[in-house]
Design a protein with these regions (language model features):
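Nucleic acid-binding interface residues in structured DNA/RNA-binding domains
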Residues: 2-114
């Protein structure tokens, strides 16, 4: 088994830490997988963040639908990307050609490590 530093550091991220961070994203705002990874001290762990969000046991109460791709596209969601988009639109997020409009304006800064 290959134990490179990226794999070891990704495995140090706890699901509960990710879920706690999600609770800091208010309705009508979004963050990215990379933003969460940076806020947790590992900017290389975006994919690990995605895997953790995919296992979210309570995706409405712990709002993983508020996490989008770094290019502003919706990204994956347990109940489908169309459902994720619907939830975001209900919170006031709009889209232009499949990308969050005013992305910089609605993107939350979760840490000073960005």
């Amino acid at each position: 088994m290959n134990y490179n530093s990226k794999n070891l550091s990704e495995s140090m991220i706890k699901n509960s830490d990710v879920y706690d961070l999600l609770l800091k994203i208010p309705a009508g705002k979004v963050s990215t997988y990379g933003d969460l990874a940076k806020a947790l001290g590992n900017p290389l762990a975006s994919q690990e963040i995605g895997r953790i969000l995919g296992k979210n046991p309570n995706p409405i109460k712990v709002p993983c639908h508020r996490v989008v791709m770094s290019n502003g596209k919706v990204g994956g969601y347990r109940y489908g990307s169309e459902r994720k988009r619907e939830l975001l639109e209900k919170e006031g997020i709009s889209f232009i050609n499949g990308v969050v409009s005013d992305f910089k304006k609605v993107r939350v800064n979760l840490s000073s490590k960005q």
